């Protein structure tokens, strides 16, 4: 911490935790003592991320000078018979696409201003084959998924459209094959392991399955997330990426 302070940089803490019940804990909001501010919000800025050494070495990462994003809008409410109509989904997709594309046209904090090209392609409630085909035909470095998800064996389930799901293992295989470097899930429970009785199954969450298959970076939610929170997060996160912030700082 003293070295980071002396260099006027944030202190990065990368947690390697293998107990599935401990991984879920929000370490970022620990307090030095009762009634004090969370350590990640204090004067000395701390940046948290989870990591694991229990993976094969990554192949050389691609070097891109633009954000090439595939935005996927899945099903919001899997138990809803009526659901959201296609027009509403198109309007939501347009809003998200503008947020992401405009994130490149900003002035970085303390900088002279740099334009970062940002191309966003959108899929609305695709089938698994449509999703795979789009990933394979594009040159995407980032995948954004907005929709519903639940913990389940094989890396959880993403609800792509009514009656159609895709598990984390299937998605991991195509993401690694297409060399996607960052996968972001604005979906509930993406970092939550599946439970068998009272026991959490190790390495069973969507985030962990993708990491262990070789996706370099995954951002997923530990709990439920409201629609407005999801929109605000995407906007702030995309702007930070366009400023060339590291992922942990962008979060």
Mark where each language-model region is.
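Caspase-like cysteine protease fold
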Residues: 38-54, 133, 137, 164-178, ...
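Short glycine-rich anion-binding loops that position phosphate/pyrophosphate groups of nucleotides
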Residues: 18-20, 147-151, 188-190
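Active-site-proximal C-terminal subdomain of hydrolase catalytic domains
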Residues: 178-251
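A short, glycine/acidic-enriched catalytic loop
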Residues: 32-33, 148-178, 194-199
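Short, charged beta->alpha transition segments
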Residues: 2-3, 53-60, 131, 166-176, ...
């Amino acid at each position: 911490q003293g070295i980071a302070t002396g260099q006027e940089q944030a202190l990065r803490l990368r947690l390697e935790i293998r107990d599935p019940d401990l991984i879920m804990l929000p370490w970022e909001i620990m307090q030095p003592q009762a009634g004090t501010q969370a350590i990640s919000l204090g004067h000395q800025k701390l940046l948290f991320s989870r990591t694991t050494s229990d993976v094969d070495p990554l192949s050389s990462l691609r070097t891109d000078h633009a954000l090439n994003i595939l935005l996927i809008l899945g099903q919001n409410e899997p138990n809803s018979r009526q659901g959201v109509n296609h027009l509403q989904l198109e309007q939501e997709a347009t809003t998200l696409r503008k947020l992401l594309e405009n994130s490149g046209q900003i002035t970085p904090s303390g900088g002279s201003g740099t334009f970062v090209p940002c191309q966003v392609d959108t899929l609305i409630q695709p089938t698994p084959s449509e999703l795979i085909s789009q990933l394979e035909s594009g040159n995407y470095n980032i995948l954004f998924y907005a929709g519903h998800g639940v913990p389940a064996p094989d890396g959880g389930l993403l609800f792509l459209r009514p009656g159609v799901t895709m598990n984390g293992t299937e998605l991991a295989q195509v993401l690694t094959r297409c060399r996607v470097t960052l996968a972001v899930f604005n979906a509930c429970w993406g970092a939550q392991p599946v439970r068998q009785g009272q026991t959490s199954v190790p390495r069973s969450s969507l985030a962990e399955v993708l990491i262990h298959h070789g996706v370099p970076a995954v951002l997923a939610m530990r709990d439920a997330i409201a629609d407005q929170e999801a929109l605000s997060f995407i906007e702030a996160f995309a702007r930070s990426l366009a400023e060339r912030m590291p992922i942990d700082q962008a979060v």
